[in-house]
Amino acid sequence: MENTPFIHIENLSYSYVGENEQPIPVLKDLSLNIREGEYVVILGHNGSGKSTFAKLLNLVIDDYTFAEGRIIVNGFDVMSPDLTDEDILELRRSVGMVFQNPDNQLVATMVEEDVAFGPENLGVPQPELRQRVDEALATVGMTEYAHHEPHRLSGGQKQRVAIAGIIAMKPRCMIFDESTAMLDPVGRKEVLETIEKLNREEGITVISITHYMDEAARADRVIVLSDGKLMLDGSPGEVFTHSDTLRKAGLDLPQCTAVSHYLITHGIPVCGEINTPEQCAEAILNAWKKV
């Protein structure tokens, strides 16, 4: 059905097994839907449950001993004991995941071989495999590095190669779990531009787990988790109006949004949402003209 969400989470609770086999709650009665083609950022402090949530979506975590509720992804009931090996393979193909440290995802001695690793294991034949690798490298702007050794690349370049490896498997959704956390500003910019391109131009559903508020400002939708519970859910502009709730969740406003709040509280008129540097600069310029 056209209106069926790509991801449906219903009353999801999940616990890790702690000392003495006692469950430690991580997610608590979480319910939400994510539509295909959305760009969603999930925010939360350390221990909020955001990374656990992401890893449940494509079976990186597959022990549901202390789990309740439902996780439906691309039509598959992820927690069902009736999932076949073919179902699991299709689920992991349709939902790719990029982790914090790109070195943990790079397995080959040449960039193009690394990108080919995933689809090759899926049984993609030549010449389609060659075409997928070339297209994936072009998408992330790494074609000229096809014959380079991955370990000689910068952090941002390595992460783009890791992303290309997922793209080559033709996913419908990509999850980025703190994928910019270990990068310098240049590397972060490269990866964020790649993520936006995948969503805007390729139509890939993007779920980005982060604690960087400026990254959240780029998304269509922001979800805030705190202590395993859903605290806020809306557009960046809607979520950032709840500054007190964000602070209680251990989060700050994006710098540009904080600047706009400062201007308003000091009697300087500012119109519209201000979540990005471009919006901030334009608002300050317009306000200056009115002074």
Predicted regions mapped to residue ranges:
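A short, flexible loop at the N-terminus of ABC-type nucleotide-binding domains that lies
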Residues: 2-6, 15-29, 61-64, 81-87, ...
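The feature captures the beta-strand-to-loop junction immediately N-terminal to the Walker
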Residues: 43-48
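ABC ATPase NBD Q-loop/coupling interface
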Residues: 70-90
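Conserved ABC ATPase signature
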Residues: 149-153, 157
